[in-house]
Amino acid sequence: MTLIDGKKLSIDLKERLTDQLREYKEQTGIVPKLVAIIVGDDPASKTYVGSKEKACEKVGINSEVITLPEATTEQELLELIDKLNDDSSVHAILVQLPLPTHINKQKVIYAIKPEKDVDGFHPANVGRLQLRDKKCLESCTPKGILTMLKEYGIQTEGAHAVVVGASNVVGKPVSQLLLNAKATVTTCHRFTKDLKSHTTKADILVVAVGKPGFITADMVKDGAVVIDVGINHVDGKIVGDVDFEAVKDKVAAITPVPGGVGPMTITELLYNTFQCAQELNR
């Protein structure tokens, strides 16, 4: 069994990116800049944005965090986004979710200029993903999953990939990326009947449902590759959506939780920020 070590891989990728950014600065004088916006005092959001800020600093990307009070109106947030859209020194914009309930998340996502939409959530980027447009900013977690498969030499072409979960953030985009990578893709969701009959056929199984230990050993084919996107808190520990201990001995490769997909998400955010800067300055 191969352990797909996202933590180690992300370190290697960030080292490569640091070199690329240094070279880009020497050639153009440009240092990519990411602006992250937090609305309210959600501790998890602050922690997550803080880790993004540290990652930016480490590779040589400028970053700024704008923290707005919980009472910020939707209009005030949209006006700030407009200002950042027009600021040529800002290459990438991120609005940390969740937002307060009085703010329409969709309106906020749509307001970000597609070329600065570092999370890849804007409809223009979703459409570009379908069309395999090279200018597409791909959603960070799905992009990280495909990078892991590639870096570990796991063939997607002709493979049967089963994705459990159909969210806009992970399930749908990773299904499309796998399809773009020439896999045959089955996407399962809460209305899928006889889930086990699908998962046991998977050469590559991606699980993103937010339920600890949801995928058990009898649901996985011998020799499969399992990508566990889940992050769940159980008895003070972080666990995935897959019963890791039960599944690990029958698979060819598997991601651990923590230390699997998670670190790759922030790494791909850094790569997307660099992509934003390159596209905006062509």
UniProtKB/Swiss-Prot annotation:
Keywords: Amino-acid biosynthesis, Histidine biosynthesis, Hydrolase, Methionine biosynthesis, Multifunctional enzyme, NADP, One-carbon metabolism, Oxidoreductase, Purine biosynthesis. It catalyses: (6R)-5,10-methylene-5,6,7,8-tetrahydrofolate + NADP(+) = (6R)-5,10-methenyltetrahydrofolate + NADPH; (6R)-5,10-methenyltetrahydrofolate + H2O = (6R)-10-formyltetrahydrofolate + H(+). GO terms for molecular function: methenyltetrahydrofolate cyclohydrolase activity; methylenetetrahydrofolate dehydrogenase (NADP+) activity. The keyword Oxidoreductase applies. Its EC number is 1.5.1.5, 3.5.4.9. NADP(+) binds at residues 165-167, 231. Pathway: One-carbon metabolism; tetrahydrofolate interconversion. One of its GO terms (cellular component) is cytosol. Signal peptide: none annotated. One of its GO terms (biological process) is L-histidine biosynthetic process. It comes from the Bacteria. Catalyzes the oxidation of 5,10-methylenetetrahydrofolate to 5,10-methenyltetrahydrofolate and then the hydrolysis of 5,10-methenyltetrahydrofolate to 10-formyltetrahydrofolate. HAMAP family: THF_DHG_CYH (MF_01576). Homodimer. Belongs to the tetrahydrofolate dehydrogenase/cyclohydrolase family. PANTHER family: C-1-TETRAHYDROFOLATE SYNTHASE, CYTOPLASMIC, C-1-TETRAHYDROFOLATE SYNTHASE, CYTOPLASMIC-RELATED. This is Bifunctional protein FolD. It comes from Francisella philomiragia subsp. philomiragia (strain ATCC 25017 / CCUG 19701 / FSC 153 / O#319-036).
